[in-house]
Amino acid sequence: MNALSEQILFELRHLLSEMSDGGSVGPSVYDTARALQFGGNVTGRQDAYAWLLAQQQADGGWGSADFPLFRHAPTWAALLALQRADPLPGAADAVQAATRFLERQADPYAHAVPEDAPIGAELILPQLCGEAASLLGGVAFPRHPALLPLRQACLVKLGAVATLPSGHPLLHSWEAWGTWPTAACPDDDGSIGISPAATAAWRAHAVTQGSTPQVGRADAYLQAASRATRSGIEGVVPNVWPINVFEPCWSLYTLHLAGLFAHPALDEAVRVIVAQLDARLGVRGLGPALHFAADADDTAVALCVLRLAGRDPAVDALRHFEIGELFVTFPGERNASVSTNIHALHALRLLGKPAAGTSAYVEANRNPHGLWDNEKWHVSWLYPTAHAVAALAQGKPQWRDERALAALLQAQRDDGGWGAGRASTFEETAYALFALHVMDGSEEPTGRRRIAQAVARALEWMLARHAAPALPQMPLWIGKELYCPIRVVRVAELAGLWLALRWGPRVPAEGAGAAP
């Protein structure tokens, strides 16, 4: 084993051993801006405001120009926060640039709601528009009319409930609809819906009503969430936190995709996480965090991980989310998630359960090229494609898909990487390699040579970029805006590099295409 392989295993082991701190998530423009706005005084928060200003793009908006659908919430939120920070150098100019940006934007919600709309868009965007309207007067910015009936319907439902239980999914967007702090209660971590923005909004309302002990818990949560960004700037917070189920689940699942799940060098760290997941999985399943509502996606991936570790978890926890032959991520979901059903399919096949309907749904949701690109939790088509290939091949050693393979190889960029935006990313290149890893096992020699050539080009690209970045460069995960679960992404990057380094004549991937 060469030095780089040893280095990869060392870093993976270190990442896995850190996963008891609630998780690591990159900084969020939207949540930071909302927390600053709800926090009151600008004094003492200049560093966070400076960070917010530094994230503004040259066109006046916030968020990646590659993915315009996810720019509205951070831009609205930043504009509103900076509007009241006028004395700060650059704030007034930033507000003017943001206003011009919004005036130029086409409204993606003019007539319908896109399938991959950000989390809580129907509640958040109309609320932000309403706040901005009182500040900007007659500015002709997008009004998002298709979201208004959805928001109204949601508010009617919320109006019929005095208090939502801790961890309810709608609490994640409390900042967009909540006004009475008694209608929500901080969870055991001190958060409202594992959301810094929601918690900051709740805290601001609670302060006015004298809920001092609860305010202290919210403050402690916001400080811990800020540390989780690794930005080193007090007041800069992530889009979601904690993620103490999602982070370990997805990391171990990724190790499986790369054939690393059972690697002896990672055995102890994997066993610790598996034992924790086994103890936490109840009859209702698991959510992204211990104190958040269970969902089908986290439950399915947890079942996969436990079965891969030799446990025999009950499938009943997943059945709660089954409606007909589909799995909803959570009750009341606006539109079905392809990746949730991909993960459910993988879990069912690993557990030896019938899955014909789910398999048919996954197959039916390909694009004309045979890939999967209509995903609501990740902006890149490479994420659901890698996971779909693994799920469809599970238990079927001879599974082949020439159409998907051809499309995947054709999508490789001239530089050797893959990416859904204007540039290749390490994360997405790793997903491409995971898919090729599964496909390679059942290919004819000619196909394997084509795959090997693509992997060699990818390896050259990856070797020039494998050092860990100080902060995530390209958030690709869909929340209220695009965000980056730092460790989850880094595990994927390292696992992809490991695969590329060790490509060549080999046995099929650990667990890929074989029964457990």
From Swiss-Prot:
<dbReference type="InterPro" id="IPR050148">
    <property type="entry name" value="Terpene_synthase-like"/>
</dbReference>
<dbReference type="GO" id="GO:0010333">
    <property type="term" value="F:terpene synthase activity"/>
</dbReference>
<dbReference type="GO" id="GO:0016102">
    <property type="term" value="P:diterpenoid biosynthetic process"/>
</dbReference>
<dbReference type="InterPro" id="IPR008930">
    <property type="entry name" value="Terpenoid_cyclase/PrenylTrfase"/>
</dbReference>
<dbReference type="GO" id="GO:0000287">
    <property type="term" value="F:magnesium ion binding"/>
</dbReference>
<keyword id="KW-0614">Plasmid</keyword>
<feature type="repeat" description="PFTB 2">
    <location>
        <begin position="401"/>
        <end position="443"/>
    </location>
</feature>
<feature type="repeat" description="PFTB 1">
    <location>
        <begin position="45"/>
        <end position="86"/>
    </location>
</feature>
<keyword id="KW-0677">Repeat</keyword>
<protein>
    <recommendedName>
        <fullName>Uncharacterized protein y4kT</fullName>
    </recommendedName>
</protein>
